[in-house]
A protein has these predicted regions:
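N-terminal basic/disordered segments at the start of proteins
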Residues: 1-13
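Charged, compositionally biased boundary regions
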Residues: 3-5, 19-313
Length: 313
């Protein structure tokens, strides 16, 4: 993710473990429906408690309500849904305070200085597990999946040579070839060899022009191989030529959403829809993500679908 600002963040907790996090723009005025919708989303995820954080805007010329007021409105909606409040935090500039802590020696009215995240234990654990630290802002987040410059014409020609025409006489053969290529490339990433075979990379990108190959690729990863496929789809997304981005961006969006990276998932869908504004899978995923489907429900749906796609190929 990225360091939020001018935001309201809601972290769902299920059986003592963080299950999902949601961020919305900081409310300009009271909107009961918006707070109820946030509470409803984490209720669907099975949350029994929540952590709320209000990153209060500092612009003096805007009619923003105080962090305490915004957190109070959200707390009412959560309690209506039988979700307990674990913590409620207001962040203004570089200071924070708990609005439910009554000990002024712990949480003075002026707040406490925010700790340096990059030198924290949490940051160290993230790096040790091979995960990137949160980006500075949403622009930097989007830049992390932006197209790389100077994609060579030879590579583009390679990709185009693997394009699958829907009326091809050997369509099923090319679909099987594409599915096999996805598996082979995934195994390279699992082995830590990444994109060491440029022709195989081009083959996967080109074959994903076929919907059956794309749907097969959408369901191929497991919990154990998620990190390898995350890296694979992210790298392919950045080097895919124009016209070949939408399938990969949609797959990466699904993987990001399953990993709890909702903001990144939406940015990936932005790339898909820039490449192909009417791309049906990207439009469907946008509706699913915006509706707040729990990642667990999305995973279950994908796992049920994959055997049928595999049988069709």
């Amino acid at each position: 993710g990225y360091h939020p600002s001018n935001s309201l963040v809601l972290v769902a907790i299920k059986e003592g473990t963080v299950s999902m996090a949601m961020r919305v723009d900081y409310p300009v005025a009271e909107n009961t429906d918006a707070y109820d919708l946030l509470a409803h989303h984490i209720k669907l995820d099975g949350a029994d408690s929540a952590l709320m954080i209000a990153y209060v805007p500092t612009e003096a010329n805007q009619p923003y309500e105080s962090g305490a007021e915004v957190l109070g409105y959200l707390a009412i909606s959560l309690l209506k849904n039988q979700i307990q409040i674990r913590e409620s935090i207001e962040v203004i500039a570089d200071r924070w305070r708990s609005v439910i802590c009554e000990d002024i020696s712990c949480c003075p009215p002026e707040g406490n200085e925010l700790p340096d995240f990059e030198s924290s234990r949490v940051a160290a654990e993230q790096v040790m597990h091979g995960r990137t630290l949160p980006f500075i802002d949403v622009t930097e987040l989007a830049d992390s999946i932006a197209p790389l410059p100077n994609i060579g014409s030879e590579f583009i020609a390679q990709v185009e040579s693997y394009f699958v025409h829907e009326d091809a006489t050997d369509l099923n053969e090319k679909q099987r070839d594409g599915a096999t290529a996805v598996v082979d490339l995934g195994q390279l990433y699992e082995a830590g060899r990444g994109n060491s075979d440029p022709d195989l990379v081009a083959q996967v990108i080109g074959r994903l022009s076929d919907i059956q190959v794309r749907d097969y690729a959408l369901g191929i990863h497991s919990e154990e191989t998620l990190d390898a496929y995350w890296a694979m789809w992210k790298e392919l997304l950045r080097i895919a030529p124009v016209g070949y981005v939408a399938p990969i961006a949609s797959i990466f969006a699904a993987v990001a959403y399953e990993s709890g990276q909702g903001a990144l998932a939406h940015k990936a869908l932005d790339r898909a829809l820039i490449d192909n504004p009417g791309y049906s899978l990207a439009l469907l995923l946008r509706r699913v993500f915006s509706a707040g489907w729990p990642a667990s429900a999305f995973i279950q749906m994908r796992e049920q679908l994959h055997p049928k796609v595999k049988a069709a190929i």
